[in-house]
UniProtKB/Swiss-Prot annotation:
It comes from Staphylococcus aureus (strain MW2). This is Clumping factor A. Coiled coil: none annotated. The keyword Phosphoprotein does not apply. A motif (LPXTG sorting signal) lies at residues 909-913. Residues 546-564, 598-874 have a biased composition (Acidic residues). Residues 913-946 form a propeptide.
């Protein structure tokens, strides 16, 4: 970074200047020779100029030769970041502090170095150069006291006070000798504060150079005039506005917003001030004990700091930001509250505010609302002061403001039930004062109380703390009744460690004219306005449930968050509503709060349309033991469009006893596109008793790619009684790759009546590798009526090892009407070991039309041991037209035989006699016997192995 430092010096046009230079030169030579003498100056300006040299242990000092021409250096504002356009300055609502630091004019090519406005800020190593003028006597000479070193820091403290007082500066020094300087008539004395800004700057100056001397500014600061001037009437483009409703409810957190805008003249310098007039009907603190106004921020830099004077107006003081900027504009928004001391009654109030000659006014209705009343009991309270520094609050309660006759009155105060109130109510933290009001008309509706106007009867009442966080006031009168109002002022403490808000409940007990014991309560809370940190109270009348027994006071449990409403009820003739809103573009350093009543009635209706596209990856280990009894009537009409990619790895151990009685009427249109990769280990033990009536009308279009690796161990006892009426149109395109190891032990008792009408169009490519071990006991009673039209195109590649041990007892009546059109290509490699005991009683009536086109290649090793007892009645009607061409006969009849006679005569002719047919039968019989023996032997070996 290219650091640029500029020093500007002004030449005083006085004859004494040359003499001063000569005297200073001689004294300088003397100091260089002895290094013991201190420089002596009668001019504050020369001392200040010397003290503004930058001294840092990490960098060398930069000095500049004084200019010899008559150019007025104060006319030029040096800042590398200043452009000719208008600079808009907006208030920063988050900045609450109002102190300012020392001025620095050192700039770089990237950002100007300006003073920051923070509380108790320590700054070090800040090089500064002087800027003075030979004609303007109002220049800030105190800029010259901004020298810092790497070893010392500046401590900035803020004193906010409404009085116009000026505090002197104390400058510490590391030398033992200090001289008090007196300003000349032609020079401005150093001044870091003005009459409106109460900032006190304590600076530590390290004077290690031999020609630098330390001096005190206490006398100078005490006698110096104000550094800045009032430029209120020089501001341009001034706008003023009052933002509020036509009615303001002070006890419902009601407030008004004051808006201001203006342009700052380019001639403004640090220390200049302007004033905003605030109407006496408003204050800027609400219920907080102190008030602050927001600083005007330019980004992270402070443009002006504000204080409140003794008249309640706001005085802003410009910082050194305006020294390096032009065309500066600013906007201010402040929340303001109805002042209870100046506006004590409900009525119309005209508010007037402004800057200089530009003003705005608005007439609003101030409505304090009325107290709560129940029969002859009346009460109202407000929290009218909060001190967050000392953690204290003040609550003012009107008891019997209606002036009715209340017999045996008792007032209790405690934390509001069901809230996290931070109030501390006990004898050590709570002080109570009671005042008697002779005339109800003397009560102010704003709850402003001047104790001097009322009779203090605190010593005449009985004040106790019977329960934790509860006080009790008994009004001891000669006739044990009251007919005039009373004011109870509670000064309490807040728990600083609590995160809750201040919330209190006051309850008045007493007998009515019919000697019925009744009670009436009033709640007080505090609400803070957005952005400003100030607020107003929320007041709401509450009529609790009435006590059951005469003289009974509701107990307060140890837990202050519980609701002691067992003896409380609500019946009120008062209606309380709240219109509260906050819109703030300003941030105020003030801590302001107010006391308000709030009642809310809300009806909410929500209409939501939702569409979901989900990618899900799930890894789940689930163990479930569930006993479920469900009786459900469900009517569902659902249109669902789902696009889901799911990767599911699930280990599930489920033991479920389910008794389900379900009537379901479902009309579903589903369009599903699913890619599923599933790896599942399942161990299921299920006892299921299901009685289901299902009426399903389903149109399904499914495109599924499935890769499944499944190990299944299933032990299932199933008793199913199912009536199913299914009308299904299915279009399925399935590619399946299945590797399955299955061990199944199933006892099935099935009674099924099935009426099925199915149109199926199936295109299937199947690659199956199956190892099957099956032990099945089947008892089947089946009545089947089947009407099937089948069109099958099948390519089958089968490699099968089969070991079958079957005992079959079959009684079958079959009536089959079959039209079959089969086109089959079969490549079979089969090894068969069969041991079969067959007892067959078959009545067969077959009417078969068969058209077969078969290409068969068979490699068969067969070993058969068969005991067969057959009783067969066969009625076969077959029409066959076969044209068989022997292997050695010519394709073209006799003509071909004549042409190839010589060739054919060399080949032996086939035997056609009866003797050859007998020989052929004998050969085949021997082969069959041998094969049977081999098969029987192999079967026996297999049984021995088992």
């Amino acid at each position: 970074m290219n650091m640029k430092k500029k020093e500007k010096h002004a030449i005083r046009k006085k004859s004494i200047g040359v003499a001063s230079v000569l005297v200073g030169t001689l004294i300088g030579f003397g100091l260089l020779s002895s290094k013991e003498a201190d420089a002596s100056e009668n001019s504050v300006t020369q001392s200040d100029s010397a003290s503004n040299e930058s001294k840092s242990n990490d960098s060398s000092s930069v000095s500049a030769a004084p200019k010899t021409d008559d150019t007025n250096v104060s006319d030029t504002k040096t800042s590398s970041n200043t452009n000719n356009g208008e600079t808009s300055v907006a208030q920063n609502p988050a900045q609450q502090e109002t102190t300012q630091s020392a001025l620095t004019n050192a700039t770089t090519e990237e950002t100007p170095v300006t003073g920051e406005a923070t509380t108790a800020t320590n700054q070090a190593n800040t090089p500064a150069t002087t800027q003075s003028s030979n004609t303007n006597a109002e220049e800030l000479v105190n800029q010259t006291s901004n020298e810092t070193t790497s070893n010392d820091t500046n401590t900035v403290s803020s004193v906010n006070s409404p009085q116009n007082s000026t505090n002197a500066e104390n400058v510490s020094t590391t030398q033992d000798t200090s001289t008090e300087a007196t300003p000349s008539n032609n020079e401005s004395a150093p001044q870091s504060t003005d009459a409106s800004n109460k900032d006190v700057v304590n600076q530590a100056v390290n004077t290690s150079a031999p020609r630098m001397r330390a001096f005190s500014l206490s006398a100078v600061a005490a006698d110096a005039p104000a550094a800045g001037k009032d430029i209120t009437n020089q501001l341009t483009n001034v706008t003023v506005g009052i933002d509020s409703g036509d009615t303001v409810y002070p006890h419902q957190a009601g407030y008004v917003k004051l808006n201001y805008g203006f342009s700052v003249p380019n001639s403004a310098v640090k220390g200049d001030t302007f004033k905003i007039t605030v109407p006496k009907e408003l204050n800027l603190n609400g219920v907080t004990s102190t008030a602050k106004v927001p600083p005007i921020m330019a980004g992270d830099q402070v443009l002006a700091n504000g204080v409140i004077d003794s008249d309640g107006n706001v005085i802003y003081t410009f910082t050194d930001y305006v020294d390096t900027k032009e065309n500066v504009t600013a906007n201010i928004t402040m929340p303001a509250y109805i002042d209870p001391e100046n506006v004590t009654k409900t009525g119309n109030v005209t508010l007037t505010t402004g800057i200089g000659s530009t003003t705005a006014n608005k007439t609003v209705l101030v409505d304090y609302e009325k107290y709560g009343k129940f029969y002859n009991l009346s009460i109202k309270g407000t929290i009218d002061q909060i001190d967050k520094t000392n953690n204290t609050y003040r609550q003012t309660i009107y008891v019997n403001p209606s002036g009715d006759n209340v017999i045996a009155p008792v007032l209790t105060g405690n934390l509001k039930p069901n809230t996290d109130s931070n109030a501390l109510i006990d004898q050590q933290n709570t002080s109570i004062k009671v005042y008697k009001v002779d005339n109800a008309a003397d009560l102010s509706e704003s709850y402003f109380v001047n104790p001097e106007n009322f009779e203090d009867v605190t010593n005449s009442v009985n004040i106790t703390f019977p329960n934790p966080n509860q006080y009790k006031v008994e009004f001891n009168t000669p006739d044990d009744q009251i007919t005039t109002p009373y004011i109870v002022v509670v000064n309490g403490h807040i728990d600083p460690n609590s995160k809750g808000d201040l919330a209190l409940r006051s309850t008045l007990y007493g007998y009515d004219s019919r000697f019925v014991w009744r009670s009436m309560s009033w709640d007080n809370e505090v609400a803070f306005n957005n952005g400003s940190g100030s607020g107003d109270g929320i007041d709401k009348p509450v009529v609790p449930e009435q006590p059951d027994e005469p003289g009974e006071i509701e107990p307060i449990p140890e837990d202050s968050d519980s609701d002691p409403g067992s003896d409380s009820g609500s019946d009120s003739n008062s209606d309380s509503g709240s219109d509260s809103g906050s819109d703030s573009t300003s941030d105020s350093g003030s801590d302001s709060a107010s006391d308000s009543d709030s009642a809310s009635d809300s009806d909410s209706a929500s209409d939501s349309d939702s569409a979901s596209d989900s990618d899900s990856a799930s890894d789940s280990d689930s163990a479930s033991d569930s006993d479920s009894a469900s009786d459900s009537d469900s009517a569902s009409d659902s249109d669902s469009a789902s696009d889901s990619d799911s990767d599911n790895d699930s280990d599930s151990d489920s033991d479920s006893d389910s008794d389900s009685d379900s009537d379901s009427d479902s009309d579903s249109d589903s369009d599903s596109d699913s890619d599923s990769d599933s790896d599942s280990d399942s161990d299921s033990d299920s006892d299921s008793d299901s009685d289901s009536d299902s009426d399903s009308d389903s149109d399904s279009d499914s495109d599924s790619d499935s890769d499944s690796d499944s190990d299944s161990d299933s032990d299932s006892d199933s008793d199913s009684d199912s009536d199913s009426d299914s009308d299904s149109d299915s279009d399925s395109d399935s590619d399946s790759d299945s590797d399955s190891d299955s061990d199944s032990d199933s006892d099935s008792n099935s009674d099924s009546d099935s009426d099925s009408d199915s149109d199926s169009d199936s295109d299937s490519d199947s690659d199956s590798d199956s190892d099957s071990d099956s032990d099945s006991d089947s008892d089947s009673d089946s009545d089947s009526a089947s009407d099937s039209d089948s069109d099958s195109d099948s390519d089958s590649d089968s490699d099968s090892d089969s070991d079958s041990d079957s005992d079959s007892d079959s009684d079958s009546d079959s009536d089959s009407d079959s039209d079959s059109d089969s086109d089959s290509e079969s490549d079979s490699d089969s090894e068969s070991d069969s041991d079969s005991d067959s007892d067959s009683d078959s009545d067969s009536d077959s009417d078969s039309d068969s058209a077969s086109d078969s290409d068969s290649g068979s490699d068969s090793d067969s070993s058969s041991d068969s005991d067969s007892e057959s009783d067969s009645n066969s009625d076969s009607e077959s029409g066959s037209n076969n044209n068989v061409v022997p292997p050695n006969s010519p394709k073209n009849g006799t003509n071909a035989s004549n042409k190839n006679e010589a060739k054919d005569s060399k080949e032996p002719l086939p035997d056609t006699g009866s003797e050859d047919e007998a020989n052929t039968s004998l050969i085949w019989g021997l082969l069959a016997s041998i094969g049977s023996l081999l098969l029987f032997r192999r079967k026996k070996e297999n049984k021995d192995k088992k």
